[in-house]
Amino acid sequence: MKKYFERIYNKGIDSFYDELKESLKSNKKSFIVTANPETFMYGEKDEVINNIILDKKTIVVPDGIGIVKASNMLGYNIKERIPGIDIATKLLEYGNELSKTIYFFGAKKEVVEKLVEKVKKDYPNLKIIGYTDGYVTNKDQIMDNISKLSPDIVLVALGIPYQEKLIYNNLDKFEKGIFVGVGGSFDVLSGCKKRAPKIFIKTNTEWLYRIIKEPKRIKRFYNSNVKFLFKIKKIDK
């Protein structure tokens, strides 16, 4: 697992946003993985996720505070979190500023429809060229259809590891575009769910807020974060 930490973007959030905007301006193709402990745990058991993390073309950013803490325990200088939902928000802002195009893929039908309505209102210069909920059967065909539209931004909200695999396996179909797997961000961006209060965000305890709101997350948290911590402690520094 230690090799994964060598792949983490470590220039800080401001530099990342500058590079993100420049990529959007210049029509580069970029695949951003928002890594948390669960991502790295999947990488240990899933060959595709392993390849995604280690692929030098993939931009791996430290989404979870567990990744930041573990990085520093292992001697890597990771400055701060770069949350996936904040990346999605920045892309909406930059896309609006630069009059770019976007495609939304994922979440429940009512959620993505509400998101589209909100984005049209809040980001009038950002052109939505399509959207699809996450409950369609042939997702690769949807990606093929999206590639023909050639959007500047593609946000995929299917949850790990499905969103990362889908993007990675279909990336060659696209000539340009910024691709990000954003998990449950559509729920928050659409207004269907509230993000954690600022005190949780500031103290890097959004994970705790999610568990309080959804206790069923405890098992998932244990299987990813707690087991991840045990693995990190066994790694030679």
Model feature map: region roles:
Residues 134-137, 175-213:
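Short, flexible loop segments at boundaries between secondary-structure elements
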Residues 1-80:
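N-terminal nucleotide/polyanion-binding subdomain common to many enzyme families
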Residues 66-71, 195-237:
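A transmembrane-helix-recognition feature enriched in membrane-embedded lipid enzymes
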Residues 29, 58, 100, 174-177:
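A short helix->loop->beta-strand "cap" motif at the edges of active sites that frequently abuts
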Residues 150-155, 160, 176:
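Proline-aspartate-enriched helix->loop->beta-strand connector
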Residues 41, 112-113, 139-140, 163-167:
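Short, well-ordered alpha-helical microsegments
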Residues 68-145, 149:
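Conserved beta-alpha
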Residues 36-40, 158-163, 185:
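Short glycine-rich anion-binding loops that position phosphate/pyrophosphate groups of nucleotides
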